């Protein structure tokens, strides 16, 4: 019913430039970013779908990406994670650095992400709500113990990955601490995300098509709370002309321009003072 109601929403989304976005952010005191897979595309992470090189073109999502597949073949999801960690040089990109800069300047207060790659934390953002979990954590299916992982531990040659699925000292098996198809997002995390959005005076929706219900519902929540919404995406999305006030046609990495404008303005103000 909620998505049906959203489909009937109408709003005139205006196209703006990065310079105009900088002016909008400069007037704000509590900015929240909602990010999706588009923010990781420039970090050499393959997309899940939509290309011949996508993850689900190589691995059957019914086996490798669902909770039912995990219970039947628990080693399969670990194979995907191991292969991606070993075969791709994954690093933070300029967009991640830009968000970290916006936080250090006092504008950005939190990041709500659908990504599981941990790149926002790696770039220096201190308050990150990872709705779909974090691939750098493993949770035991028996005792619920959570183990922190790193890039080395996820490599093919690591002790942790030498036998799949990895086993907990209690005898149980580890599952990546991420949301698989068939699982639901934690209600506590959704509540935390809504609380952050309720406090914001600007929501940046970056690199997400907003077709996943989690993102759509959070944007709808912001819309109902009359929050200003700006999309940063290379194309229009599901919420364009429905919920967003502005749309910036840009790659995630191009946010560097916004960060530099605001950083320059901040330094200029310090000199005047």
Swiss-Prot record:
Add the further remark from the entry: The reported ADP-ribosyltransferase activity of sirtuins is likely to be some inefficient side reaction of the deacetylase activity and may not be physiologically relevant.
Tell me the CDD domains matching this sequence.
SIR2-fam
Q: So what EC number does this one have?
A: 2.3.1.-
**Cofactor requirement:** Zn(2+)
Q: Which family does it belong to?
A: Belongs to the sirtuin family. Class III subfamily.
**Top EC class, one word:** transferase
What protein is this chain from?
Answer: NAD-dependent protein deacylase Sir2A
- Give the record's free-text account of how this protein's activity is regulated: Inhibited by nicotinamide. Inhibited by surfactin, which is a competitive inhibitor of NAD and an uncompetitive inhibitor of acetylated peptide.
Q: Which GO terms describe its biological process?
A: regulation of DNA-templated transcription; telomere capping
Q: Which GO terms describe its molecular function?
A: DNA binding; histone deacetylase activity, NAD-dependent; metal ion binding; NAD+ binding; protein-malonyllysine demalonylase activity; protein-succinyllysine desuccinylase activity
Question: Where is Zn(2+) annotated to bind?
Answer: 140, 143, 168, 170
Which positions are catalytic residues?
Answer: 132 (proton acceptor)
Instruction: Tell me the compartments it is located in.
Output: Nucleus; Nucleus, Nucleolus; Chromosome, Telomere
Binding-site positions, NAD(+): 36-56, 114-117, 132, 207-209, 233-235, 252
The organism encoding this protein is Plasmodium falciparum (isolate 3D7)
| Catalytic function, reaction form | N(6)-acyl-L-lysyl-[protein] + NAD(+) + H2O = 2''-O-acyl-ADP-D-ribose + nicotinamide + L-lysyl-[protein]
